[in-house]
């Protein structure tokens, strides 16, 4: 069975591009949502292997780090990962309890694909 990914806050350009990558490379099913409330509702339904959160949510400009905090505080046992090229944002996400993520500049790198795959299989 493939990986199930919850993708939070990507824009209309990056979201479909990332979804296609995960589907092609990881045989993943990707659900895209646009807010922390949506993410929490989807997580409660279960079945996800990993949550990817954009640093800035495209729909309203809110902080992906705040989304990560909410998800972690909710008690989820699903690994949460920040999508950001900014090292300081990655550091803050890890401090909040997330797994160190990746930036879009390295999106198609084999190491990024492997990171998502290995994290989702934890």
Regions inferred by a protein language model and the residue ranges of each:
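Conserved acidic segment of CheY-like receiver
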Residues: 2-13, 18-22, 32, 51
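Alpha-helical interaction/dimerization surfaces of two-component signaling modules
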Residues: 20-25, 92, 96
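Acidic, metal-coordinating helix/loop segments flanking the phosphotransfer/catalytic sites
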Residues: 34-50, 56
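Conserved phosphotransfer cores of two-component systems
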Residues: 44-46, 70-77, 96
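Conserved phosphotransfer microenvironments
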Residues: 51-71
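Alpha4 helix (beta4-alpha4-beta5 surface) of REC/receiver domains from two-component response regulators
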Residues: 84-102
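Receiver (REC) domain switch/output surface
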Residues: 95, 111-122
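Hydrophobic/aromatic docking surface of two-component receiver
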Residues: 105-107
